[in-house]
Curated annotation (Swiss-Prot):
GO (cellular component) term, any one: cytoplasm
Tissue expr: Expressed in somatic tissues but not in oocytes.
The species this protein was found in: Lymnaea stagnalis (Great pond snail)
Quaternary context: Oligomer of 12 or 24 subunits. The functional molecule is roughly spherical and contains a central cavity into which the polymeric mineral iron core is deposited.
Substrates-to-products reaction catalysed: 4 Fe(2+) + O2 + 4 H(+) = 4 Fe(3+) + 2 H2O
Main location: cytoplasm
Disulfide bonds: none
Assigned protein family: Belongs to the ferritin family.
Iron listed as a keyword: yes
Record InterPro entries: Ferritin (IPR001519), Ferritin-like (IPR012347), Ferritin-like_diiron (IPR009040), Ferritin-like_SF (IPR009078), Ferritin_CS (IPR014034), Ferritin_DPS_dom (IPR008331)
Name assigned to this protein: Soma ferritin
Compartment(s) of residence: Cytoplasm
Pfam families xrefs: Ferritin (PF00210)
């Protein structure tokens, strides 16, 4: 494999970290895709949840693509790994799925924070700026949004409450 002419101040550990983050984002996308089509089933039938999780899946895939583009820009090499299967196939109620989604977003956020710490330890200001401007603020917003949804789903309860939340909150947003 040839060495990139574009490479400058790009540590091998940072390059490997970007590849791990690509995998993490693709795993999140894969998990959200599973959630989306669970809520699209005829025996679940919550189209707002389907739409919300499908949008989340697309967003995570876009994050992976952004990281791949960045890897190439810095002269790194993209090394894809196997994407782990989501932890489950059945996602339960909307509340349960949102709780899983919140944990997933917190895991992605922690991975990004670890990557930020790594690139900072190698004095890579460009990568730190990239992570801050493209990912970290968005993660905080996503965690807050999911937390709000969980609070409201607890408030309205399962059954009819969840159905109304699906119609009034999720179908009208994104």
């Amino acid at each position: 494999m040839s060495v990139s002419q574009a490479r400058q101040n790009y540590h091998a550990e940072s390059e490997a970290g970007i590849n791990r983050q690509i995998n993490m984002e693709l795993y999140a996308s894969y998990s959200y895709q599973s959630m989306a089509y669970y809520f699209d089933r005829d025996d679940v039938a919550l189209p707002g949840f389907h739409k919300f999780f499908k949008h989340q899946s697309e967003e995570e895939r876009e994050h992976a693509e952004k990281l791949m583009k960045y890897q190439n820009k810095r002269g790194g090499r993209i090394v894809l790994q196997d994407i782990k299967k989501p932890d489950r196939d059945e996602w339960g109620t909307g509340l349960e799925a949102m709780q899983v989604a919140l944990q997933l977003e917190k895991s992605v956020n922690q991975s990004l924070l670890d990557l930020h710490k790594l690139c900072t330890s190698h004095d890579d200001a460009q990568m730190a700026d990239f992570l801050e401007s493209e990912f970290l603020e968005e993660q905080v917003k996503s965690i807050k949004e999911l937390s709000d949804y969980i609070t409201n789903l607890k408030r309205v309860g399962p059954g009819l409450g969840e159905y109304i939340f699906d119609k009034e909150t999720l179908s009208s947003s994104s």
